[in-house]
Amino acid sequence: MGLRRAKSIRHNGKRLQEILAAHELFFRGQEGGVRANLAGADLSHADLAGVNLSGAILRGANLEGTDLRRGKLPGADLSGANLRKADLRNTDMTESILPGADLTEAQASGVEFFRCDLSNANFQRAHLRNVNLRGANVNGAKFSGADMGVAILRETDITGADLSGVDLSTALMPRGYAAQKSPQKPA
């Protein structure tokens, strides 16, 4: 099954392609622009690569398996959104709002999560290589089993995050962080 195109997806009686065009005008401050409100939208398995959703409202949206590579989502509200197995590689999500979002098994390498609210988000088994989590709120976030090689966690309070089973040996950690070794199983 291939990815769905924006022109074939509808939300609240409007074509997604039209919503995205109006949002682009809004983002540029041009006449006729309207902020995209895609709260609760079914955008699963959609091809949204490179789309500008800066400041868009995507609360509770279903983006499972969606291609958002190289997208622009700074300041977007993705609270409680389903991003399971989504492709977010090299996406800018600076200051986005994602509390309670599900990013299980997401391809999120190279994502800019700078100063994001990721509280209680689920990143289990996600690919998070080379992500920037500087200044992000990760309280209650679940990273267990995630690939976080070369992740930037400086200026991030990770005390409330579940990092079990995560290899942080190549990550840039907060000052004073002492890696805790996993207990060794007897041979």
Locate each region found by the language model.
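Tandem repeat scaffolds
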Residues: R4-E18, E24-A187
